[in-house]
Design a protein with these regions (language model features):
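N-terminal secretory signal peptides and thylakoid transit peptides that target proteins
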Residues: 1-15
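N-terminal catalytic or cofactor-binding beta/alpha core of small enzyme domains
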Residues: 11-275
Length: 276
C-alpha cells in the first residue's frame, strides 16, 4: 500500500503570498488506508451507501449520429475522490470547477463551459478519514470509466501543511500529475490570482506521478492533481461554516478565485487540443 512519505516542493507562484522555498523537509503524511481499493470499501457489510458514504456524478451525453458533423470527445472530467467529510471542501470545489453551484447541479446552466464530474464523499458525522482510498488504488468502475473517456482529468484533494512539508498555518496548493502543460497553466493562473502554489514532487501520492493514479487514467494518460492545505480550504468558507452541511452556502471570494483559476487553466488546455 502506498502512503504519503516524502515531499519536496519548488516555488512556482504568487510572491505576494510568500515563498514556499526550494526544498522542504521530509514528512510522514497519510496513514495507511483501511481499505486497499474502492471495491473493498463497497464490499464491507458494515458500511451503508447513503449513510456512511455517497457518490455523485454528472456525465454529459455524447451523441454522434451525423457523419458530417462529428461530436467532440469529452474534454475534461473533474473529480473529488475524497470528498464530503474526508477532505473537506473538495466536493464543493469539484462542482464549482465543473461549472455548477457548489450546492449541486441545477437546471440553469451557469456562464462558461460545463465539465463532467465524479466524487466520492464521506457522509459520517465523524470518522470519515477511515473511508480514504489512496488515488493509485482507486477502482470505482464508473469513476474510472469517466476518467478513461476524457482527454483531461483534474483531481482535487486536501492535505495538512505538515503533510505538505510546509510551515504551520501555510495556505497553499500543490500542483501534481503527469500533464506538464496543465500544471504550467495552473501555476500561472494561481500566480495571477495571488494564490500560493508549488509544484509537488517526491512522494507519489501527493505528486500524482504514478500512471495508476486516477488523475492520470485519462485518454492521454496524464492529468493534474491539486492538493490544498487545510488552511487554504478553510479560508474559502465563512468562519464557523466550514462543515459538510454548511460549506456550499457559505463560500468566500477565495473559493471563487481558486475556481476561476482552475477553470481558466482548463480552458487554455482545451483550446490546444483537437476537436476529435
Amino acid at each position: 500500500m502506498i502512503d504519503r512519505r516524502t515531499l519536496i516542493t519548488a516555488l512556482v507562484a504568487a510572491p505576494a503570498m510568500g515563498a514556499l522555498g526550494t526544498a522542504l523537509s521530509a514528512t510522514t503524511a497519510h496513514a495507511a488506508d483501511l481499505y486497499d481499493s474502492n471495491t473493498a470499501l463497497y464490499a464491507d457489510p458494515a458500511l451503508v451507501e447513503g449513510v456512511d458514504y455517497g457518490r455523485r456524478l454528472r456525465r454529459h451525453l455524447v451523441d454522434d449520429q451525423d457523419p458530417a458533423a462529428a461530436a467532440a470527445p469529452v474534454r475534461t472530467t473533474v473529480i473529488a475522490p475524497h470528498g464530503g467529510g474526508i477532505e473537506g471542501g473538495t466536493s464543493e470545489l469539484c462542482l464549482a470547477i465543473a461549472g455548477y453551484s457548489p450546492a449541486g447541479p441545477t437546471d440553469t446552466a451557469p456562464a462558461g463551459p460545463l465539465h463532467d464530474f465524479w466524487m466520492f464523499e464521506g457522509l459520517r458525522s465523524s470518522g470519515n478519514s477511515a473511508l480514504h482510498v489512496t488515488s493509485t488504488h482507486f477502482d470505482d468502475l464508473t469513476g474510472r470509466a469517466m476518467c478513461a473517456g476524457s482527454l483531461n482529468v483534474v483531481s482535487l484533494h486536501g492535505c495538512t501543511a505538515a503533510q505538505a512539508g510546509l510551515e504551520a498555518g501555510a495556505a497553499a496548493v500543490l500542483i501534481g500529475g503527469l500533464n506538464a502543460t496543465l500544471r504550467q497553466y495552473l501555476a500561472e493562473e494561481f500566480a495571477a490570482a495571488g494564490i500560493r502554489a508549488a509544484t509537488a514532487t517526491g512522494d507519489e501520492e501527493i505528486a500524482g506521478v504514478h500512471p495508476q493514479n486516477i488523475c492520470n487514467r485519462s485518454l492521454l494518460g496524464a492529468g493534474a492533481q491539486l492538493e490544498l492545505t487545510t488552511e487554504l480550504r478553510a479560508a474559502m468558507f465563512a468562519p464557523g461554516k466550514n462543515t459538510r452541511l454548511d460549506r456550499a452556502a457559505n463560500t468566500l471570494p477565495l473559493f471563487w478565485s481558486f475556481t476561476a483559476a482552475v477553470r481558466t487553466a482548463i480552458q487554455r488546455l482545451e483550446a490546444t487540443q483537437p476537436v476529435r
